[in-house]
Amino acid sequence: MSENTSPSIAAVRDLREASCSPIGAPTVTNDLSENVILTSLDDLHNWARLSSLWPLLYGTACCFIEFAALLGSRFDFDRFGLVPRSSPRQADLLIVAGTVTMKMAPALVRLYEQMPEPKYVIAMGACTITGGMFSADSTTAVRGVDKLIPVDLYLPGCPPRPEAIFDAVIKLRKKVGDESLAERRKHQQTHRYVTVSHQMKRVEPVVNGSYLRAESQKAALAAAPAGQTLATDAAVLTPAAEPLES
């Protein structure tokens, strides 16, 4: 081939080097490069918020004792930037730990309404999430705090260990880091929760001593052999104490 139609080896080498690194080396000095950060507004805003969550501690029962263990030197609660606040107007994270009763429900809702946006809620413990062991017999326990305020993260356990609380905080930090300012403004009005004037529905008391006459007892009577009856008196069900031998 002629020289006009076939490029030289040196020209091909120069073209390959130019295509592999089409942009030259930056002219920014080392001192200046360590002081310049290229980021977006969402990333900068989310990084500042997830690194300095200020919780409002709402502890009503034994779950809060596990949370109090985080304040010691063994778990180092402050390394996540969490600074407990005593005023809801200075907090952006509400940690509900323990049973929520009908009488305390308006106070909890008022605390949530006084917190500035954006705000988050962690439901800690079985009693907070579903009512726990008080959901069957108690007439004053709220069956889930999400019936009062929106919950961002559920932390099951009875009670949860301090390591589980750390895991919940880490997951909440990831959620905060993935948020967008534009999307949060769109979905902010979709969060619905009751107000302090909400009338709680009360149920009939079930602690009346009639457990032996419940549906489960009726099923046991139906399954019993013919001619055999089950005792329905608590005194009969309680075994008598055996006499002591002298």
Curated annotation (Swiss-Prot):
InterPro entries: NADH_UbQ_OxRdtase-like_20kDa, NADH_UQ_OxRdtase_20Kd_su. PROSITE patterns: COMPLEX1_20K (PS01150). GO terms for biological process: aerobic respiration; electron transport coupled proton transport; photosynthesis, light reaction. It is an enzyme of class 7 (translocase). It catalyses: a plastoquinone + NADH + (n+1) H(+)(in) = a plastoquinol + NAD(+) + n H(+)(out); a plastoquinone + NADPH + (n+1) H(+)(in) = a plastoquinol + NADP(+) + n H(+)(out). It is a peripheral membrane protein. Its EC number is 7.1.1.-. Binds 1 [4Fe-4S] cluster. Transmembrane segments: none annotated. One of its GO terms (molecular function) is NADH dehydrogenase (ubiquinone) activity. Its main location: membrane. NDH-1 shuttles electrons from an unknown electron donor, via FMN and iron-sulfur (Fe-S) centers, to quinones in the respiratory and/or the photosynthetic chain. The immediate electron acceptor for the enzyme in this species is believed to be plastoquinone. Couples the redox reaction to proton translocation, and thus conserves the redox energy in a proton gradient. Cyanobacterial NDH-1 also plays a role in inorganic carbon-concentration. NDH-1 can be composed of about 15 different subunits; different subcomplexes with different compositions have been identified which probably have different functions. This is NAD(P)H-quinone oxidoreductase subunit K.
